[in-house]
């Protein structure tokens, strides 16, 4: 039974844990924070998480995927950092817009307040006004949730690297939080690189020492260090680092590279990071309940079968652009005790029949994920054609649904079928701009934060494949799009092609799901939504699970 507090029993302070990074970026702070959160939940605590992003963008919604990676959409429609996807998957809970704080959001709020006269004529400065706004957003994560439950622990990851000029207001705010709520209610974890020099055969501790010195110079004394390395850090080196960085030996944790990100909680558990933190913060706890996670790790490390899943996309040079899609595919594989090997396929390589045959010939299943713009679109449509003709299981997501509809429309005699996104003057726009998106598309309104975002309900056709996969006919999925199936062409496409419009918005206006009759194709399903955002490693999403099951069934048939 959870020891979480409610608003009627609020005697114990919410504890705040801050995770910072040093030496280099991309150390895995987000995964470390999420893994610690999972561990604390396994000990019966209520945990929520937050990402503090130093960039000046209000959110990543308008950022190039090559710049930022995936944009993760929350239930309430916030476009956030991809680390929130890790948080949701590891904690198995939905987060909100409040879980992602950017410099852009903070400055926008402070400047708007100044314009309204909220500072009563005072000079607005980084300290205290910007830091106060950051602190308010951090402390607000400790408020009761919609069920009246107050979290036991809030874990806040500070993006960037200690020493970055952009991170300074966030680190100063974190320092002030510790001062305000009491040191007994606050815990700092610093992730640092311990590089291995092959020429000398040594692990070097000096970068970590310098990084901690930089952190201490701004008033933050780390309580624990997570040492990132490509191998185990010996106890002697951990003792040396503890001495030189003035950290308890029990608080120096080795976290080497691992085959699967889902083994990180187990690594931190064996290093006793959770027990050290619980002891320091005087948290109530129980023995770790590993039941669900151990079953997951057994499936991760002991697959019984293997399939290859191709992802046909525009941004495949940066796999992080499709991070949640990859994790959803892997989770579906775990559910079926199957290793899923991911093959990255550039959509431009599939434009011709010969190119599609070369690029797609060795895959057992295909996923066509979301994206924007005309580049590579004909390759995605050609990939749909190849999958349809060769009966390869295919799942289309967002833009993937639109490609499936365009391909079916061309089968139905609409040879010029396309989307107004790719050709605003299209003669046969089977995909068109949503009415409420016209202003943004025409440049008369902001692009950022104006798409159809967040969770929306859909009604599935009784007896359809998607209804069978979900097990229900009323579902809810997250969205991020401006374009929709043009209802003027629905009847013609439905009558002249095997495509079935198997799910719509409750009012029947928006097409949300399409599929092919199973007599025509074993598994060709697409959704306007982004179901990958709701997948969990311990609970595969039904659509991805269905894709993997179809690929396994096809492999048995072929054998």
Curated annotation (Swiss-Prot):
Positions with a binding annotation for CTP: 25, 164-166, 204-209, 240
Active site positions: 398, 530, 532
Organism, as annotated: Corynebacterium efficiens (strain DSM 44549 / YS-314 / AJ 12310 / JCM 11189 / NBRC 100395)
Residues the record lists as binding UTP: 25, 204-209, 240
Organism ancestry: Bacteria, Bacillati, Actinomycetota, Actinomycetes, Mycobacteriales
Known regulation of activity: Allosterically activated by GTP, when glutamine is the substrate; GTP has no effect on the reaction when ammonia is the substrate. The allosteric effector GTP functions by stabilizing the protein conformation that binds the tetrahedral intermediate(s) formed during glutamine hydrolysis. Inhibited by the product CTP, via allosteric rather than competitive inhibition.
Residue ranges occupied by any Glutamine amidotransferase type-1 domain in the UniProt entry: 308-557
Domain of life of the source: Bacteria
The protein's name in its UniProt record: CTP synthase
Protein residues bound to L-glutamine: 371, 399-402, 421, 482
Pathway named in the protein's UniProt entry: Pyrimidine metabolism; CTP biosynthesis via de novo pathway; CTP from UDP: step 2/2
One Pfam family from the record: GATase
EC class of the enzyme, as a word: ligase
Binding sites annotated in the UniProt record for Mg(2+): 83, 157
